[in-house]
């Protein structure tokens, strides 16, 4: 594994379905928002899924993203609080992504992954996204706070996610950033 800047890595990766494991620290938001900001500077359509759109818009403004000037390219997608509702709508949202424009997606997953049923469903969703990824022109970053994944099923779930992604970013406030790509 190589240690480096996560945003630079994502920026140089090209089109890829990426899993981003993190500790939900300030560094996490800095990485996500910097990735979005760089896409907006290139006039790429940037999507951010969240359970709290107003708070994310506020945080983006504080980070230095001009959300009003970039409203044509910045798309904040509200996701349901309950995982069961989320799992139904996310695949529809993926189908709605522009296929001719360059895109960047940060898809946040702040659910409590505390059962194999939830992790199996999430792995199934990720595989569906990956199966249709060739239709997208850009990066799709699936952002997971590792502390929301129950210890007993964490290893199994992480392995399931590796099956449907081409690159992995591990980032913690203490440990920094490690990345690797999969064949």
Language model: regions and residue ranges:
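Non-catalytic regulatory/interaction regions at protein termini and inter-domain linkers
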Residues: 1-183
